[in-house]
Swiss-Prot record:
InterPro entries: P-loop_NTPase, Thymidine_kinase, Thymidine_kinase_CS
Gene3D superfamilies in UniProt: 3.30.60.20, P-loop containing nucleotide triphosphate hydrolases (3.40.50.300)
Record lineage: Eukaryota, Viridiplantae, Streptophyta, Embryophyta, Tracheophyta
Cross-referenced PANTHER family: THYMIDINE KINASE (PTHR11441), THYMIDINE KINASE, CYTOSOLIC (PTHR11441:SF0)
Protein name stated in the entry: Thymidine kinase b
Chain spans, region Disordered: 45-76
Amino acids binding substrate: 194, 238-242, 247
Residues at which ATP binds: 84-91, 116-118, 162-165
Pathway named in the protein's UniProt entry: Purine metabolism; Pyrimidine metabolism
One family name in Pfam for this protein: TK
Function: Part of the salvage pathway for purine and pyrimidine deoxyribonucleotide synthesis. Phosphorylates preferentially purines over pyrimidines.
Record note on disruption phenotype: No visible phenotype. The double mutant tk1a tk1b is seedling lethal.
Length: 282
């Protein structure tokens, strides 16, 4: 894992948890939040397998403040990075921060990778069912054109990026937005994959970030602090979209033990498959 001597956005140790709750997302150490936001319910409701509680928002994909004056880009912006394993509350934290910025009168937009199709394509959705409209894009370089160059330059203050590990142009986009265009960029994504290797270019943002927050979850086995994501299935590709049916948050001890169990099970399965192939060829 990496260490950073930077102030964090939230304190993971304050999050509630209960070992008796079934959903891994409720083990998250991210702070829960509640906003009183009125009048529009975003479309594309999450499926019934998640909570039906939704954020009521005034925004569609972009929220404008009462002022429509062009922005001044004379001063640099900021970059804030939120990382952690699955079910640690990264999207929840991103959404809380973005809505807090909106409450101060900032104009906001949220982007997520179009690879994330778990709940709905036109909104970011937390594991608890809270949602907010967003731009679902294959890359970040197309955002300015889709959003509108003039609107991007003059009527946008804060950009949220969810599932950031899937964007290959993440570093370049964030650096330019903050350094040259005066935007505040809040990024949420996985720092490591199921093999505990770096995932995408999220970690590349640390040297240019104003703050970095490392969230943790709760181990699905023992309830201790979970830093890692374990894959339950046999697939070995890095990018495999899934939720609790595919992944679980685990502590270091159960990651190591679990990996040994999974590797043994896979070896037995491979051996059984090989014997079946040999027998069928006789």
């Amino acid at each position: 894992m990496f260490g950073v001597s930077m102030r964090t956005l939230i304190s993971p140790s304050l999050a509630p948890f209960s070992l008796h709750l079934h959903k891994p997302s409720l083990f998250s150490t991210a702070l829960r939040f509640s906003f009183s936001i009125n009048n529009i319910t975003p479309t594309n409701s999450p499926p019934s397998t998640i909570s039906t509680r939704k954020l009521q928002t005034k925004a569609t994909r972009v929220t404008s403040s009462s002022s429509s004056q062009p922005l001044s880009s004379s001063s640099p912006g900021e970059i804030h990075v939120v990382v952690g394993p699955m079910f640690s509350g990264k999207t929840t934290t991103l959404l809380r921060r973005i809505l807090a910025e909106r409450e101060t009168g900032k104009r906001i937009a949220i982007i997520k990778s179009n690879k994330d199709t778990r709940y709905c394509t036109e909104s970011i959705v937390t594991h608890d069912g809270e949602k907010y409209p967003c731009w679902s894009l294959p890359d970040l370089s197309s955002f300015k054109e889709r959003f509108g160059f003039d609107d991007y330059e003059n009527r946008l203050d804060v950009i949220g990026i969810d599932e950031a590990q899937f964007f290959g142009d993440l570093y370049e986009f964030c650096r330019e937005a903050a350094d040259k265009e005066g935007k505040t960029v809040i990024v949420a994504g996985l720092d490591g994959d199921f093999m505990r290797r770096r995932f995408g270019s999220v970690l590349d943002l640390i040297p240019i970030a104003d703050t970095v927050t490392k969230l943790t979850s709760r181990c699905e086995v023992c309830g201790k602090r979970a830093l890692f994501t374990m894959r339950k299935t046999e697939e070995k590709e890095t990018e495999l979209i899934g939720g609790a049916e595919v992944y679980m948050p685990v502590c270091r001890s159960h990651y190591v033990c679990g990996q040994n169990v999974l590797e043994t099970a896979r070896a037995v399965l491979d051996s059984s498959n090989n014997h079946s192939v040999v027998a069928s060829s006789l």
